[in-house]
Each structure stands twice: as structure tokens, then as C-alpha cells.
Amino acid sequence: MARIAGVNIPTAKRVPIALTYVTGIGHTSAAAICEAVGIDVTRRVNELSDAEVLAIREHIDANYAVEGDLRRETQMNIKRLMDLGCYRGLRHRRNLPVRGQRTHTNARTRKGPAKAIAGKKK
């Protein structure tokens, strides 16, 4: 199994599909990486030489924020919004939808399970 950015990528899959197992690399980025390194998109990971895997690893390290770094950057951006006290930061702080969705009904994913209110039965 090849390790790229700390992730064991599957060897039986095609290279662009296997690269999407790394957080921060989607289909478009994976295809761009293959093109930049000069690897055919129809090849499978187990057909790659060690030099090709190393070239992919170096290209990703140089040009992409992936895995822990990407998660840390996202969390720092959210923390910055919360510290600023802007509207988006307040919505994050209160665990409510941030992008303008309605909350009178719905928004259960963000708000969590419904809380029972005493004296509501009749």
C-alpha cells in the first residue's frame, strides 16, 4: 500500500480515484496532480514505481493543503470568525446554520435532536 500525506491509499484502484482518499483532494485536484506529474489516469496504484509515488507525494506536499493542515486551517478560520464576533461567528458559536437557512422549522442537523418542552401536550 502506498502512503501519501499519511493516508494508506488503496492499491487496486486507479490513481485519480485512490488520491481522493486523501482529505483535501477531490476528483479535479487528483486529475490535475496526475497530469502535472505525468501519470496516465488509467493506471492503477500497484502499477506505479516508487519514484512515481514519490513524485506524487512531493507535488501534493508542495502545492496542496491536505489532511491535518487543512483541518487545522478550517478550524482556525472558524475560530477567527467567532473571536471577531461577526454574524457568521455568532452563528457558529450558537450551533445554528451559518448560511441563511431557515430555523423556524428544520435545521435539525445543526441544532441537534429536538428538546421536549414541559406542558406542551394537550
From Swiss-Prot:
Transmembrane segments: none annotated. It holds the Pfam family Ribosomal_S13. One of its GO terms (cellular component) is small ribosomal subunit. InterPro entries: Rbsml_uS13_C, Ribosomal_uS13, Ribosomal_uS13-like_H2TH, Ribosomal_uS13_bac-type, Ribosomal_uS13_CS. Coiled coil: none annotated. Part of the 30S ribosomal subunit. Forms a loose heterodimer with protein S19. Forms two bridges to the 50S subunit in the 70S ribosome. NCBIfam families: uS13_bact (TIGR03631). This is Small ribosomal subunit protein uS13. It comes from Jannaschia sp. (strain CCS1).
